[in-house]
Amino acid sequence: MYQKLPNATLLKSGHLSRQFRKIGIFTFHDACDFVWKLPYGRTSDKSNWLLVLSERTGTCSTKHALLKALANELSLNINLVLGIYPMKESNTPGVGTVLEKYGLEYIPEAHCYLEYKGKRVDLTRHGIRCDEEITEFFIEKNIDPDDIGEKKQGIHKNYIKKQYGIDKFKKIWAIREQCIGAL
């Protein structure tokens, strides 16, 4: 999966490189493997991607933002992408029961991943088998690691408001939160 990305030896002087080196990780690919294998879960501050290392968990946003920041430190030309996709059981196992309860086929969900030379690399959930990969996106936008908090949420909420209207927004967002809780 992460072999599609360029590799580099971590720096002795870089802040993030030092954090990874302290735990025995010395290359970008090793950092990708480590982060990919961490369990899926929100950190105590969902916009602070540095917490992935200390809390040993992360979401698509925090895991990929951390790796993008490390790539920046190593001068690797890798993009952090925010995409809005149709979240459904076949591409996000665990959400089907919630969607079925409300008679929904899908809910537009924000997803972050890395991109290199036109290839998507998703290191969110290791070992999870899906009937289909997430390949359909309504929108895709390059973002910076520090955009995974309010800016990402704003883009996501605005998309849902446009899709369903202001009147239904709160209900759809609440269903979305139930879906995330089911993961």
Task: Identify the function of each model-found stretch.
Residues 46-103:
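Active-site neighborhood of thiol-dependent amide/isopeptide-bond enzymes
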Residues 30, 65-66, 109:
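Short Gly/charged-rich anion-binding patches and loops
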Residues 33-34, 69, 73, 116:
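Residue-level signal for well-ordered alpha-helical scaffold segments within enzymatic catalytic domains
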Residues 2-4, 8, 18-23, 40, ...:
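His-Asp-centered catalytic microenvironments across diverse enzyme cores
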Residues 1-58:
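Secondary-structure boundary elements
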